[in-house]
UniProtKB/Swiss-Prot annotation:
Protein name: Ubiquitin-related modifier 1 homolog 2
Lineage: Eukaryota, Viridiplantae, Streptophyta, Embryophyta, Tracheophyta
Pathway where this protein functions: tRNA modification; 5-methoxycarbonylmethyl-2-thiouridine-tRNA biosynthesis
Post-translational modification remark: C-terminal thiocarboxylation occurs in 2 steps, it is first acyl-adenylated (-COAMP) via the hesA/moeB/thiF part of the MOCS3 homolog, then thiocarboxylated (-COSH) via the rhodanese domain of the MOCS3 homolog.
Main location: cytoplasm
Protein encoded by which gene: URM1-2
Gene Ontology biological process: protein urmylation; tRNA thio-modification; tRNA wobble uridine modification
Subcellular localization(s) per the UniProt record: Cytoplasm
Its job: Acts as a sulfur carrier required for 2-thiolation of mcm(5)S(2)U at tRNA wobble positions of cytosolic tRNA(Lys), tRNA(Glu) and tRNA(Gln). Serves as sulfur donor in tRNA 2-thiolation reaction by being thiocarboxylated (-COSH) at its C-terminus by MOCS3. The sulfur is then transferred to tRNA to form 2-thiolation of mcm(5)S(2)U. Also acts as a ubiquitin-like protein (UBL) that is covalently conjugated via an isopeptide bond to lysine residues of target proteins.
Length: 99
């Protein structure tokens, strides 16, 4: 499955300062579905280069990270249980900024 992953609000610094990633992900289990929980695990293993604790806490994103799936807040679509489809665009934006 192909996805576009975008990181903003400083999260791109955890991915070698690359904001947009076009990725291909093979299904992690024998089913035909991939969930946000599966994707987050893949991102932690394959994209996050440093300080993964700044992006994730346990199995989910840290508080203060806005997640959009095809421009829709993931809280409206089931969060970790959100089912992803080929060519989806997932955006991660940190809403926490120093000052």
């Amino acid at each position: 499955m192909q996805f576009t992953l975008e990181f903003g609000g400083g999260l791109e610094l955890l991915c070698d300062s690359v904001k947009i990633h076009k990725v291909n992900i093979n299904l992690l289990n024998d089913s035909d579905i991939l969930t946000m929980k599966d994707l987050l695990s893949w991102v932690r293993t394959n994209l996050i280069k440093e300080r993964p604790e700044m992006f994730m806490k346990g199995d989910t994103v840290r508080p203060g990270v806005l997640v959009l799936v095809n421009d829709c807040d993931w809280e409206l679509s089931g969060q970790l249980d959100t089912t992803l489809e080929d060519k989806d665009v997932i955006v991660f934006i940190s809403t926490l900024h120093g000052g």
